[in-house]
Amino acid sequence: DTRGAEEFAGRDVRASRGGHIPGSIHVEWVNNVDEDGRFLPASDLKELYASAYITDELGDIYTLCQTAVRATHSWYVLADLLGFDNVSVYDGSWTEWGNREDTPIDS
């Protein structure tokens, strides 16, 4: 989940329900770049994701945010800069998940 911490926790609600998908891991997309907006070196990015237990051995990885824009940024980091083979963007992202009544949510 690449959204901000308040969105992930369910305090910044941008759909009919707030929170996050159960079992999701939060790594905010802005952590991929330095203060000038440039991508961090690959070694730093690898360390960032490894510290959140996100490795290429994890299995299928789906990035999401509110509308898949920030998620695509993190997808690029994982798939292109770090070379993960198992990454996809959840296109519906939180707009879809958070507005459905039949999806589980943690906060």
Region annotations inferred by a language model:
Residues 2-107:
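Rhodanese-like catalytic fold shared by cysteine-dependent sulfurtransferases
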